[in-house]
Each structure stands twice: as structure tokens, then as C-alpha cells.
């Protein structure tokens, strides 16, 4: 059984953190420069939420909403369901589907352990015969290269 801990071990350990008071425009630039769709929001070593492209687009659709005047705290998702490091990929998929989210923060007790995306879960489910480490290590997450080992 593939658990959250197993998926996190095989992902890059580098998470992209941002402070809740960071300006939204700067956060957008950071997302773009890193080619990421989310940033983990941390304050004094404590998980606060996730800043996502999806949440940003929803806020920007609000009439009169000005990104230049907003902080990450104004946009971040704080009520996402969470998984434990022992959660199975099936449990995590159920959480994502039932809560309409693409990201799950993962905790080891009360300690933030990382984020698992829908994409991470799909890779783990569709390609269980090869190491996720091989997949994540390939330049663009190349399925064919990872399958060939």
C-alpha cells in the first residue's frame, strides 16, 4: 500500500514557502519563476495554508479586487482537508475528490510533512510498477523514461 509518507519520500524535499504577509504580486512572480501551481504558507515554522493559482483566480474574479493591495493571507486556502503520513493513496484521493481540491497538506502528528498533489497521486496509481523516485528524477516527469528504468 502506497502511503503519503512513501510519496513524500520520493518527491523533491524542496517546498516553496512564503509568509502570509507576502504581497500577492510577488507571490505570483515566485510561482511563475518556479513554474509551480502552489506555495506553502508558513509563519515562524508553522503551517498556515496553501497559496494556489486556483484560489488566486477565484479572488481576482471578484469585482474591485486588486492584487497589488493584497497579501498571501488574503488568498491562501486555510481549510483544506489534511492527510496523515499513514494515509493511503485511496484515502487521499477520496479526500481530494470529496473536498474538490488538488492539494493535501500532510502531517506527521502536528508537524507539517509536505504537500501531495492530485498529480502525485495519479502518478502513484497509474504507474505503481516503477519507483516514483525515478519518475520525479526524470527531467520533465517523463513516463516513458521512468518506465524503461
Give residue ranges: language-model regions:
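Tandem CBS (Bateman) regulatory domains
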Residues: 1-13, 52-82, 88-97, 117-149
